[in-house]
Amino acid sequence: NFFHNLFFPIRFTNNLLQLKFQNSAEELGRFLVNTIWGIGGLMDVAKSELQWQAHSEDFGQTLGFYGVGDAIPVVLPLLGPSNLRDIVGLGGDYYLSPLTTMGDNSIKYKIPNNLREEFALETVYTTNKASLRLGQYESLKKDALDLYPFLRDVYAQARKKQIEE
């Protein structure tokens, strides 16, 4: 929950760019409620008490919203299946992420303050995200005759559905 709350700028901005103004407003509300009453985002009070759902959008989906095709499928080490559009989208999300060292370097107590701190925070985030999905990968492996094309197709279909929503 903490990391989900922390990545509010990515979801908020991409909802705005996709002209999903209601979703943007709900993301802003979720961020404020979870930051104030959810102890800095450790608890998801907006979902448990107010039934406000998260609207996860990223820059890859935003590019898809504006008609950019998925192009070449790629498998990224540790990150799994992706495509050229979503890899470009990672750059946009990286710029918006509060865990990056980009932006105003005159902020005295900015975290992360250097690349080492950024790498450590991203590692914790990625490990946490992966630990929440261990069972999904094992169940997919059981259902696949050939894992690579199966994962590629599952990813492509899931992204297409996310962009259409």
Range-by-range predicted roles:
Residues Q61, Y66-E165:
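A structured, mid-to-C-terminal "fold-capping" secondary-structure block
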Residues N1-L84:
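Mid-length scaffold segments of soluble, non-membrane domains
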